[in-house]
């Protein structure tokens, strides 16, 4: 019996108003899973209720979470980081979060713990019901169990004193030495050593009287003949390949090819890493996987930089538009105000209180305080002209 697939369908509040579109989305989800209604459990929720904590859902429960958002503008598809973390907890290991996802939050997605992968267009259209191009799918990675190394406790003895080394006692028979016999043995050994030195450095190693080389020289030549040049091997290999039609065995048949690395026998869940001097091609496969992952991350970072530059250009255009706007004053703003009339005040409203309360450009600077409505004469302008 196949295990059931748990799917969480997150809907934007604007989608809930159209019941026909919701049923159409559900039917497409069933079609993508071969219309096996009994093995699929779809839980339909509004995304606002989950973000506010009104509804609590079980963690590590859902195989897929599909988000439906009819808004096409990217600013209305933004998902907060708290909601990303909640979705990460709700998904099972290797679970997928797909649908109408934002395209400018890839850095937040990676920081949350997801892996961004591409999904084919046809499968994505069947599950989401949207006619868009190839999109990215957020995948919750499978946790890797780290091996636990148990350390053995060192045995401690209560005896702090160290035992002394034991020496074997010699017998009395071993202590007696036959002195003349030992002296004869020493002299014989010295004689043998001298004879070997003389034979090694004798004149036989040099050229003989006939002009022929000695036996040692001939042995050295034979050793040199045993060395094989790499180019000669290649020529010999080509020659044997040409003679294969005559039934002769080629030199390449004698070569030993290394055995290809196989998967581990413990369930086949994880393959072994390539050896240090790998020759079966497993190391190249691992390097290809790393390069593909690096290219994907570079594409994501490139799109992030592109979106940042576009946002900066928009901000500059907004500032230019604000700077081009000119402030226009009305006739009431430009009308003159008589500061001496009661009920009329200036910009600061404190001209009559004295210099301590007047502005820098006030014409009453230097004059004593006066009451509103009192006639004030300004003299001394002729001296400044």
Curated annotation (Swiss-Prot):
The keyword rRNA-binding belongs to this UniProt entry's keyword annotation: no
Biological processes, Gene Ontology terms: iron-sulfur cluster assembly
Residues the entry annotates as binding [4Fe-4S] cluster: 348, 351, 359, 362
Span list, region Fe-S binding site A: 261-280
Region called Fe-S binding site B, residue ranges: 348-362
Disulfide bonds: none
Compositionally biased spans, kind Acidic residues: 217-226
GO annotation, cellular component aspect: mitochondrial intermembrane space
Residue segments, region Disordered: 200-226
Motif (Cx2C motif 2): 359-362
Region annotation Linker: where it falls in the sequence: 178-240
Entry keyword annotation includes 4Fe-4S: yes
Chain positions of motif Cx2C motif 1: 348-351
Compartments, as annotated in UniProt: Cytoplasm; Mitochondrion intermembrane space
Region named N-terminal SAM-like domain: 1-177
GO molecular function: 2 iron, 2 sulfur cluster binding; 4 iron, 4 sulfur cluster binding; electron transfer activity; metal ion binding
Positions contributing to [2Fe-2S] cluster binding: 261, 275, 278, 280
Cofactor entry: [2Fe-2S] cluster; [4Fe-4S] cluster
Keywords (A to Z) from UniProt: 2Fe-2S, 4Fe-4S, Cytoplasm, Iron, Iron-sulfur, Metal-binding, Mitochondrion
Family: Belongs to the anamorsin family.
Main function: Component of the cytosolic iron-sulfur (Fe-S) protein assembly (CIA) machinery required for the maturation of extramitochondrial Fe-S proteins. Part of an electron transfer chain functioning in an early step of cytosolic Fe-S biogenesis, facilitating the de novo assembly of a [4Fe-4S] cluster on the scaffold complex CFD1-NBP35. Electrons are transferred to DRE2 from NADPH via the FAD- and FMN-containing protein TAH18.
Subunit details: Monomer. Interacts with TAH18. Interacts with MIA40.
PANTHER family assigned: ANAMORSIN (PTHR13273:SF14)
Domain notes: The C-terminal domain binds 2 Fe-S clusters but is otherwise mostly in an intrinsically disordered conformation. The N-terminal domain has structural similarity with S-adenosyl-L-methionine-dependent methyltransferases, but does not bind S-adenosyl-L-methionine. It is required for correct assembly of the 2 Fe-S clusters.
Protein's UniProt name: Fe-S cluster assembly protein DRE2
Gene source species: Candida dubliniensis (strain CD36 / ATCC MYA-646 / CBS 7987 / NCPF 3949 / NRRL Y-17841) (Yeast)
Top-level taxonomy: Eukaryota, Fungi, Dikarya, Ascomycota, Saccharomycotina
Gene: DRE2
């Amino acid at each position: 019996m196949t295990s059931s697939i748990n799917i969480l369908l997150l809907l934007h509040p604007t989608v809930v108003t159209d019941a026909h579109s919701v049923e159409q989305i559900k039917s497409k989800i069933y079609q993508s899973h071969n219309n096996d209604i009994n093995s699929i459990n779809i839980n339909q929720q509004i995304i606002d209720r989950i973000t506010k904590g009104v509804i609590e859902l079980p963690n590590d429960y859902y195989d897929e979470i599909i988000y439906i958002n009819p808004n096409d503008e990217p600013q209305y598809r933004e998902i907060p980081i708290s909601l990303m973390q909640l979705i990460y907890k709700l998904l099972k290991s290797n679970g997928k979060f797909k649908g109408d996802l934002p395209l400018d939050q890839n850095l937040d997605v990676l920081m949350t713990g997801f892996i961004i992968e591409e999904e084919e267009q046809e499968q994505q259209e069947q599950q989401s019901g949207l006619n868009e191009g190839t999109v990215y799918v957020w995948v919750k990675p499978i946790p890797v169990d780290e091996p636990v190394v148990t350390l053995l406790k060192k045995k401690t003895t209560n005896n702090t004193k160290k035992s002394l080394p034991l020496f074997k006692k010699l017998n009395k028979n071993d202590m007696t030495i036959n002195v003349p016999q030992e002296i004869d043995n020493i002299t014989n050994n010295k004689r043998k050593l001298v004879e070997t030195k003389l034979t090694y450095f004798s004149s036989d190693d040099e050229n003989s009287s006939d002009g022929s080389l000695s036996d040692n020289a001939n042995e050295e030549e034979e050793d040199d003949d045993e060395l094989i040049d790499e180019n000669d091997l290649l020529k010999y290999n080509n020659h044997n390949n040409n003679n294969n039609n005559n039934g002769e065995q080629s030199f390449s048949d004698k070569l030993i090819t290394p055995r290809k690395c196989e998967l581990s026998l413990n369930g086949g869940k994880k393959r072994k890493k390539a050896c240090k001097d790998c020759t079966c091609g497993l190391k190249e496969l691992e390097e290809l996987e790393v390069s593909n992952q690096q290219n994907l991350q570079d594409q994501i970072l490139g799109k992030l930089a592109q979106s940042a530059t576009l946002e900066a250009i928009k901000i500059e255009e907004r500032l230019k538009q604000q700077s081009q706007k000119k402030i226009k004053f009305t006739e009431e703003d430009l009308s003159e105000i008589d500061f001496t009339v009661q009920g009329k005040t200036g910009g600061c409203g404190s001209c009559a209180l004295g210099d301590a309360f007047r502005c820098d450009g006030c014409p009453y600077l230097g004059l004593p305080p006066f009451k509103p409505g009192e006639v004030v004469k300004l003299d001394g302008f002729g001296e400044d002209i």
